Amino acid sequence: KRYKLCMLLIMCITMTYIAAGCGSKRDGLTITNVSYDPTREFYEEYNKVFADYYMAEYGKQIKVIQSHGGSGSQARSVVEGCNADVVTLALEHDISLIENTGLIDAGWKDEYDKDSSPYTSTIVFLVRKGNPLNISDWDDLIKDGVEVITPDPKSSGGACWNFLAALSYARDKYNSEDKQKEFLGKLYANVSVLDSGARGSTTTFVENKKGDVLIAWENEALTSLASYPDEYEIVTPSV
């Protein structure tokens, strides 16, 4: 049973507040996209395509400044005054937090037909090459001695999806709510590092070589695999 976990990222939510210093200039336009951690590489490429489109459509240059971090932290930074023209975040809750301040007009969820999302990913495990602990599903992550790396749900949108994927697995396997809570408790007892964002967790696992398994967005795991094809492999859990 697989779930495509929608990243409720509204790709072009224009803030009703236009940050000071951002705006039209004679030589073009500069805007700031406040986004979450694993979208760095995507927007580096997407911004080039968007700039070409903007020039062809409007005859002006446009430069997009990128800001990345944990989705929850990014949302709070905008509420607290961070200059942003566009926000692309991992959770509906994070965008609603900004909407509640009046910086985004109500009705942003209706911008896409059928409440769709611009793009999606799913949750996977990244393990060391050869999968030495034979990790295949969520049950393996609660075994004694397995060191898990995942970001903190308090600050990271990806971490919330990691938690919800684990919860979905627990609900499928256990009828008892107590058993479901016990499963989640064991899982997070095995987490050795709770970074503030998904990219921080990737750095902890991939660069700093900590942990046995990283719970991650599939696109984030694929980025690591492309950089280190001989050191890691992806395991796709049942949920």
Map each language-model feature to its residues:
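Short, low-complexity disordered leader/linker segments with a strong preference
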Residues: 1-30, 52
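Alpha-helix termination/capping residues and helix-transition junctions
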Residues: 16, 80-81, 208
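Bilobed "Venus flytrap"/periplasmic-binding protein-like clamshell domains
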Residues: 40-45, 154-182
